[in-house]
Design a protein with these regions (language model features):
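Short beta-strand His + acidic residue motifs that chelate non-heme Fe in jelly-roll/DSBH
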Residues: 99-102, 119-121, 130, 139-151
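A short beta-strand-loop-beta hairpin characteristic of the jelly-roll/cupin
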Residues: 112-132
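Signature of the catalytic double-stranded beta-helix
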Residues: 7-92
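Conserved small/polar residues in nucleotide/adenosyl-binding loops
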Residues: 1-6
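Short, conserved beta-strand element in jelly-roll/cupin
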Residues: 92, 103-119
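A short hydrophobic beta-strand segment most commonly corresponding to one strand
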Residues: 109-112, 136-138, 152-168
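Tight coil/turn sites that cap or link beta-strands
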Residues: 94-96, 133
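Residues that flank catalytic or metal-binding motifs in active/ligand-binding sites
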Residues: 86, 105-107, 154
Length: 168
């Protein structure tokens, strides 16, 4: 099982477990490849900079063997019949923490697994709590966004990159 904690990912209070990988390439779920490329405006100049490495999302087609006989595989199979998916990960946001204001290359599909009322996602300055009620959310992560957990319990989402979803 490939669990990456906040230390190995380089982001405080964040952890990820990759559920699929590039076929035959266990390194495709390690280090910065759990995060992937994103863009941010880190200072008062407002100049956008790129962080991390580009990911070839369309190559992530093999489910990690440790998770083949789990409900996550069933969910992956159902969703991949409807959407073209890239990486699918379990992402943890620890209590009282936030990500940077950033944007990603593609939309994301979220299924909240464990959450609390203080766990909020802000996309293009619109805040939304996603309850863990079995709903599937698709967020436009190509717009600037962040996720924060202002609660006192962990937030865990099943998150997949969606390669063929177009917003109006």
């Amino acid at each position: 099982m490939c669990i990456r904690d906040s230390t190995s990912l380089g982001i405080p209070h964040f952890a990820g477990i990759s559920l699929n990988q590039i076929p035959g390439d266990p390194d495709s779920i390690k280090g910065s490849k759990v995060r992937g490329v994103y863009w941010t405006k880190p200072d008062s100049t407002g100049k956008e900079v790129s962080r991390d490495v580009a990911i070839e999302e369309e190559k992530y087609t093999e489910f990690v063997k440790d998770f083949e006989h789990t409900y996550f595989k069933e969910v992956y199979d159902v969703l991949s019949k409807r959407y073209k998916l890239g990486r699918m990960r379990l992402l943890l946001k620890e209590p009282r923490s936030t990500l940077s204001w950033h944007r990603d290359p593609e939309p994301r599909l979220h299924i909240p697994i464990y959450t609390n009322p203080g766990a909020i996602m802000v996309v293009d300055k619109v805040a939304q709590h996603m309850p863990a009620d079995g709903s599937v959310w698709i967020t436009n992560n190509t717009k600037y966004h962040n996720a924060f957990n202002g609660g006192e319990e962990n937030r865990v989402h099943l998150v997949a990159c969606v390669l063929d979803y177009k917003f109006n």
